[in-house]
């Protein structure tokens, strides 16, 4: 059981010296066998609340904490951080930050080994968690070879294997395909039946319909609304939109996605393709990732690339933008065969893990790395367009996941490259900023760029895509090349 009373947390910003009230008077009770959903806009304090429930705040994050957090009757203020793992397991927003081992099997056993659990019990719990999350076939794989979605499933499996009575999951589906999201739902159903206390922070809300027992809405560090699960999922679209929340309806698999906002693209009417691929193939050693891939990407057009986790979508866009060399095939720019260096110069890339491409110590500095004219009023307007203007003094790496995502997209727009490639740009993004990113990508396309987006987000793809390409695991090839949305 989790019991939170009058919880408040504040700290002094190292950059500005100002006091930041990250949590304000939060109260929460969560019982065994229940699931609590916490939602709200990016940067409202959801992740800080989760870090407080794990004891990382204030033990690892300096600041002033008021109120009480009790798990299974124990006050976390009196529990050494090394013992908190007995009480709760957690899945962070970025799963890469919580891994310690080389392979999936080693990572699954890591927690239990540190607590001296019996070897037989370790093996059984690891295999059970891996099967529950659909990653048993990955047990011998190195973590460094997995896709972002596969890593997210490994992090969830590690939490399940720990055997702790409480699960804290911070956006556990942000990089997952529809089938993997269904795996997460089944796992959460199983854990509820086993009597686990579960708290989930999410922007994607549809998959918890019928599972969430209570729903909390956070704004500016405070809980401002509470519903039962039934009340929450009965609200109208008008109510949901007024609260800035994403759809409550499952968009389904890629073949069910239907456009409501794509304009068709200004380049769809007859211009030759900006980027063209013919018979493109790539493999890791003897393992093929995709074979015989053919596609054209036009100026003014937004093309979404969908497919299961690990099918090769990220590898494909790395090849397209020149970061990785294909084994065979040809890639042309404006009808002329291109080199990798030419494609790197022509492409702006927004990576899946945006923290890996933040290099400056200011937000404006990030914009000017690829565009020297994106300073002063130009930079301020661009930051304002992405709802980042009030964060100008923050270090980029101190931003929330959604804020980092928007900053890197802003930098890509500032660079004004003819090809813009984005890998999961809406992971960790709330409804308002999803709409903002959709509008921005449409503007970039309308200005003449070819926009290529890897996504599992049906709500997003239906709002902006002109065309959908679906990669399949059979051969990594294009199962649904050129479907118009």
Model-predicted segments: where are they?
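H-loop/switch region of ABC-family ATPase nucleotide-binding domains
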Residues: 202-203, 455-456
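Catalytic Walker B motif of ABC-type/P-loop ATPase nucleotide-binding domains
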Residues: 167-170, 420-423
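Conserved ABC ATPase signature
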Residues: 142-146, 150, 395-399, 403
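ABC ATPase C-loop
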Residues: 159-160, 412-413
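ABC ATPase NBD Q-loop/coupling interface
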Residues: 68-83, 330-343
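Hydrophobic anchor residue at the start of the ABC signature
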Residues: 156, 409-410
């Amino acid at each position: 059981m989790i019991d939170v009373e009058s919880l408040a947390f504040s700290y002094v910003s190292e950059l500005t010296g100002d006091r930041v009230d990250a949590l304000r008077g939060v109260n929460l009770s969560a019982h065994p066998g229940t699931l609590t959903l916490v939602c709200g806009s990016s940067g409202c304090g959801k992740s800080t609340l989760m870090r407080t429930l794990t004891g990382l705040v204030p033990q690892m994050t300096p600041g002033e904490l008021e109120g009480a957090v009790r798990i299974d009757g124990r006050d976390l203020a009196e529990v050494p951080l090394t013992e908190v793992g007995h009480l709760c397991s957690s899945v962070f927003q970025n799963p890469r930050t919580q891994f310690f081992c080389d392979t999936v099997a080693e990572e699954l056993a890591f927690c239990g080994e540190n607590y001296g659990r019996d070897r037989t019990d370790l093996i059984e719990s690891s295999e059970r968690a891996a099967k529950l999350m659909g990653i048993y076939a990955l047990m011998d794989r190195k973590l460094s070879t997995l896709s972002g979605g596969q890593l997210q499933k490994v992090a969830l499996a590690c939490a399940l294997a720990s055997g702790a009575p409480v699960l804290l999951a911070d956006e556990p589906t942000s990089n997952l395909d529809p089938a993997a999201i269904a795996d997460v739902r089944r796992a959460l159903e199983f854990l509820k039946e086993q009597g686990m206390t579960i708290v989930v922070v999410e922007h994607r809300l549809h998959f918890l319909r019928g599972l969430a027992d209570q729903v909390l809405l956070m704004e500016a560090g405070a809980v401002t609304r509470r519903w039962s699960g039934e009340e929450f999922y009965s609200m109208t679209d008008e109510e949901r939109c007024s609260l800035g929340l994403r759809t409550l309806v499952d968009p389904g698999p890629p073949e069910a996605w239907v456009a409501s906002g794509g304009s068709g693209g200004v380049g769809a009417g007859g211009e030759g393709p900006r980027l063209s691929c013919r018979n493109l193939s790539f493999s890791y050693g003897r393992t093929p990732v995709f074979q015989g891939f053919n596609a054209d990407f036009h100026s003014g057009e937004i093309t979404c690339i969908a497919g299961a986790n690990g099918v090769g979508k990220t590898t494909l866009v790395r090849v397209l933008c020149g970061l990785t060399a294909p084994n065979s095939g040809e890639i042309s720019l404006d009808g002329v065969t291109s080199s990798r260096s030419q494609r790197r110069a022509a492409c702006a890339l927004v990576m899946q893990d945006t923290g890996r491409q933040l290099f400056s110590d200011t937000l404006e500095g990030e914009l000017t790395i690829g565009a020297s004219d994106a300073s002063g009023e130009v930079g301020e307007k661009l930051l304002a367009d992405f709802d980042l203007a009030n964060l100008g003094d923050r270090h980029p790496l101190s931003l929330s996941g959604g804020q980092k995502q928007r900053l890197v997209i802003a930098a890509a727009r500032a660079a004004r490259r003819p090809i813009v490639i984005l890998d999961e740009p809406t992971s960790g993004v709330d409804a308002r900023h999803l709409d903002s990113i959709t509008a921005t990508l449409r503007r970039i396309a309308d200005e003449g760029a070819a926009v290529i987006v890897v996504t599992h987000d049906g709500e997003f793809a239906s709002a902006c895509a002109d065309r959908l390409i679906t990669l399949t695991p059979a051969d990594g090839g294009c199962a649904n090349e050129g479907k118009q949305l």
